[in-house]
């Protein structure tokens, strides 16, 4: 009764093809590779943004190891809480769950330690030690 009008708008916008189009994995990887070529030409905050964007593109393309690599570089260059930090926690948890399902104790411990180090980083940032 109250939400009838909103439902009509949703269905009409979807029928018109106005819903956001997701890039396919190849396009995401291509965009990430193009950005990788620009990393050396940027510095400071712009470099961090590029590294985070590359990590994000790889994450969307389900290239978890590559996403982790670029987010870790971003965190090592700019020790602050933000997108790289939150995405790394998600990625480490994905890898930890994969290790659990494969019954790989070493990998599981590795990613638990990685998560612990991120937790320590967050404590250090909050306390102003970094």
What do the PLM-derived regions correspond to, one by one?
Residues 37-41, 75-76, 110, 117-120, ...:
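Conserved structural position within tetratricopeptide repeats
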């Amino acid at each position: 009764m109250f939400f009838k009008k909103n439902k009509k708008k949703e269905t009409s916008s979807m029928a018109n093809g106005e819903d956001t189009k997701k890039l396919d994995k190849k396009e995401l990887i291509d965009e990430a590779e193009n950005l990788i070529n620009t990393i050396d030409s940027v510095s400071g905050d712009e470099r961090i943004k590029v590294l985070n964007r590359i990590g994000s593109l790889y994450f969307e393309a389900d290239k978890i190891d590559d996403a982790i690599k670029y987010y870790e570089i971003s965190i090592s260059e700019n020790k602050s809480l933000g997108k790289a930090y939150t995405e790394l926690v998600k990625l480490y948890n994905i890898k930890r769950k994969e290790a659990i399902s494969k019954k790989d104790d070493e990998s599981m411990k590795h990613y638990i330690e990685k998560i612990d180090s991120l937790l320590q980083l967050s404590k250090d940032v909050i306390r102003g030690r970094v």
